[in-house]
């Protein structure tokens, strides 16, 4: 047997077996890793001393429960933005620091950093991975750059223009349902419920050219399995995010919720795969000519555009990539837009003078026109309605925070240093409610977005669609849908606040506990 003298280690002349040697090497490696981690942690703590931090709950939990995802937590975010107007340090337990930015001057360095320097923090987004795959939301590096480049033309106004008719049709369906409910005596409606189905309805038509009738079916029986699965996945991800001990995959997928999540993922993927395979099966050999000819006679849906897309080398997206992007678009497009629209109607219900002015602007635009449809060129002719939308997105941003992880040290304008590996939170809600950026931030005032008032304001003061190279690629799509739905809805209905004030709730998007309820009246029955 091989024998080694380990006397130099201080053990005297001892016969060492290979197992002992392996143990020594392993212990040395582990010690080196611990020392390296300790040095990095100490160095990070030294660099982070310049950042102010609120008082800790205790040494172990630190700031873990400082900002709960409730109305109280959102008020705490506003208070923290007031106390630490440029940003602050919090500890997620005893050893994990996070820097929260709530001021345009400070978040600029993170928001404008390249995707390689400040990629998304996957600890924050990993729960979506089995559902969305490597779509734009979750991909990184060269794959993200390639997909972003390929998909940007997908949201060109020439592609979006035909979707206006889809938005109009889906809105008309919702209005017909509302009129029926109101005649039955149901004048108190949950905006989130109805607008979520509207956005899912329009998205399925825009993405797949598929009419699920989900809005009509909802009043008498459950929507399609696909729609149910989308809603279930959103709910399960938000629920898991609150359950810290189920963040580990090996634990979560042993639970009933984990099984439900995987089942819903399979259902969503099967639906998307079936659409892609059917579309590919029916495509002729000359795909480009076929799709271009189709575009002249029919609206190209998102799947068509993805099939048509190719890079400089002529390479197309794989079926797996197309599925990931379609699923990502469905996820990002329905909940966020529904949240935005719900809070806009809430704010207009609270401020009837602004609601009436928006209505008059739309009525004036469509005066003496046979068709009461909003056309693409009309969107720029609704300045006050646009101001009201933006102010609502400031006060109630659908996405309240985004998370980044620095791959290198980043020096801020004031000389502070964000150490490599530290998680950074861009607090959209905190920035929008920061009194050093927005005077009287809790007041709903659309005139903040008047052209004169915008001058001199940092573009990073208003970031409902994020900012920088990883901003929301579909923001024009979302704003277009919100303008069309809001304009047509104000032509037919008047909104009044409910007796109970909603309590805001931070999940994947900004919701209201128990729904966002408003009193809805047909315009013809309302006082003039």
Swiss-Prot record:
PROSITE patterns per the UniProt record, alphabetical: CYTOCHROME_P450
Cited Gene3D superfamilies: Cytochrome P450
GO cellular component: endoplasmic reticulum membrane
UniProt key word Transmembrane helix: yes
InterPro entries, alphabetized: Cyt_P450 (IPR001128), Cyt_P450_CS (IPR017972), Cyt_P450_E_grp-I (IPR002401), Cyt_P450_sf (IPR036396), Cytochrome_P450_Monoox (IPR050196)
Catalytic activity: prostaglandin E2 + reduced [NADPH--hemoprotein reductase] + O2 = 20-hydroxy prostaglandin E2 + oxidized [NADPH--hemoprotein reductase] + H2O + H(+)
Residues reported in the UniProt entry to bind heme: 332, 472
Signal sequence, renumbered to the chain: 1-36
Transmembrane segments: 87-107
GO MF terms, alphabetically ordered: heme binding; iron ion binding; monooxygenase activity; oxidoreductase activity, acting on paired donors, with incorporation or reduction of molecular oxygen
CDD domains for the chain: CYP4F (cd20679)
Domain of life: Eukaryota
Broad EC category: oxidoreductase
UniProt KW keywords: Endoplasmic reticulum, Heme, Iron, Membrane, Metal-binding, Microsome, Monooxygenase, Oxidoreductase, Signal, Transmembrane, Transmembrane helix
EC id: 1.14.14.-
Subcellular location: Endoplasmic reticulum membrane; Microsome membrane
Cofactor(s) the protein requires to work: heme
Topological category with respect to the lipid bilayer: Single-pass type I membrane protein
Family statement drawn from the similarity comment of this UniProt entry: Belongs to the cytochrome P450 family.
Main function: A cytochrome P450 monooxygenase that catalyzes the omega-hydroxylation of prostaglandin E2. Mechanistically, uses molecular oxygen inserting one oxygen atom into a substrate, and reducing the second into a water molecule, with two electrons provided by NADPH via cytochrome P450 reductase (CPR; NADPH-ferrihemoprotein reductase).
Name the record gives this protein: Prostaglandin E2 omega-hydroxylase CYP4F21
